[in-house]
Amino acid sequence: MLGVAAMPSTLALVLKKILIANRGEIAVRVIRAAREMGIATVAVYSELDRDSLHVRLADEAYALGGQTAAESYINTEAVLNAIRESGADAVHPGYGFFSENPDFARAIAAMGVEFIGPPPEAMDEMSDKVSSRLAAVRGGAPIVPGTTEFAQGPDDIRNFGNEHGWPAVIKAAFGGGGRGMKVVKSADDVDDAFASAQREALAFFGRDEVYVERYLTWPRHVEIQLVGDKQGNCVWISSRDCSAQRRHQKLIEEAPAHQLADGIEEAMGEAAVKAAKAVGYYGAGTVEFIYQDGEFFFLEMNTRLQVEHCVSEMITDIDLVEWQIRVAAGEELPMTQDEVTASRRGHSIEVRINAEDPAEGKFLPSPGRITKLVPPDGFGVRFDSGYLSGDEISQFYDNLVGKLVVWGRTREVAIARTIRALEAL
C-alpha cells in the first residue's frame, strides 16, 4: 500500500474516502474532483500501472496484481479486497470495467459501501438493448421500428425485413461499440449475418442474444446527458453530437448538437428524462438517440459517465463528477431544469487522442513509451489525460492517451480553437 496524508472531507458525515475502480484519465478525473471536495481518494493498480499518474495523485493506492484487465481491474475479488483494506465508504467505477455491472454494484452494497452510479435495478433494465427499448416505450420515447424480444433465428430477421423493408440491422442485445452488429441488405444475406452477429456477440460480451431493427441509412448520433438524484429529480444537462465515428467508435464529440430542427433538442431532453424516470434512475447517465429527416429514435441508455461528458461540462460549468458524488451521498440536485438550461453558453468540441500507427491507413493501436507529451493550452482549452511524458502505454488497455476539449463562444470559434490546439499538441 502506498499513501500520503488525506485532506479533510467536506462531506465527512457521509463520504470520507472514495476508491476509484479504474485507471487512466477517468481515474485522474475523479481523483481531482474528489480532492476539490475534500474527500480522500484510493487508487487501485495493476503491476503495469504501479507508477501511473492516477496512483501518484491518489491519497492511497492498492495493488491488484496481474497485467491484463482480467487479472486486475475486472478481477472482482481483488477489487473487493482493496475496498475492504482501504476502508473506502464509496466506489466510483469510472467508465468501462465495472461501471455498468449491476452484480458489482450489489456486491459492494452488501459490504455497506456506496456505489457512485445508478441503482443496480436500473442497470439491469438498461443493460440489454431489448429491455431498454421497452423501458423507453414506457417513458414515451420513440424507438426505431424493431423487435422487443430476442431474435430466435434467421427466420425472425427475414420476416422483419420483408415486413419493414431492407436493409435491416442485427445487433448484439448486450453489446455496443459496433461489435455484433451486422447490416443485412436482403433476405439472401440473413443466414450468414445472423451467425456472424451471434459469434461476435458471444466473443465480446459473453452473450449471443441478438435483435433486429430498421436500418437508417444516414443517421446522426445525438445523445442527451442527464443526472438524477435519489429524491426522484432528474434534469438533462445538454445534447451532444457524436456522429463522427470510425468503426462505430466515437472520435469527435460536440455540445450542443448543431443544426437540429426546431424543438428537437428539447424533445430529446424530455424523452431522455422520461426514460430515466421509467426505471427509477439516479446518478449520471446518457440516453443515445439516432436522428434522421427531422425524426429521432431512442437507441440505448449508457448507465455511467461517458468519455465525452467533458463537452457538456464546458458549456454549462457543471462538474458532473461532483454531481455524481453528491447524488451518491444522498444530496438533491443543486440546480433545477430551468437553471441548467439558463447556464448553457457557447459550443464545445472534444477530440480523442489515441496511440495509433497510421501505416497503410489501418490506424492500429501502437503501445509503447511516450517520449514527449506537451498538452496544448490557452483560453478555452482543456486536456484530460492519464499520462505524462515518459509513461508507458500498455497493449493490455485502451489506447486513449487523452481528450482535447475546447470551448468557444460559437461553433466556428470552437472549431478554429480546436485546430489551433491540435497543431500545438
Tell where the protein language model's regions lie, with residue ranges.
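Glycine-rich active-site loop/lid that clamps phosphate-bearing ligands
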Residues: 333-334, 338-398
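N-terminal beta-alpha lobe that positions the nucleotide/phosphoryl donor
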Residues: 8-287, 291-306
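Short, well-ordered beta-strand elements within core beta-sheets of diverse protein domains
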Residues: 181-183, 214, 260, 400-409, ...
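Active-site "cap" helix and flanking loop/linker of ATP-utilizing ligase/carboxylase catalytic domains
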Residues: 254, 260-294, 302-359, 423
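Extended active-site and interfacial segments that coordinate phosphate-rich ligands
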Residues: 196, 200, 229-260, 303-330, ...
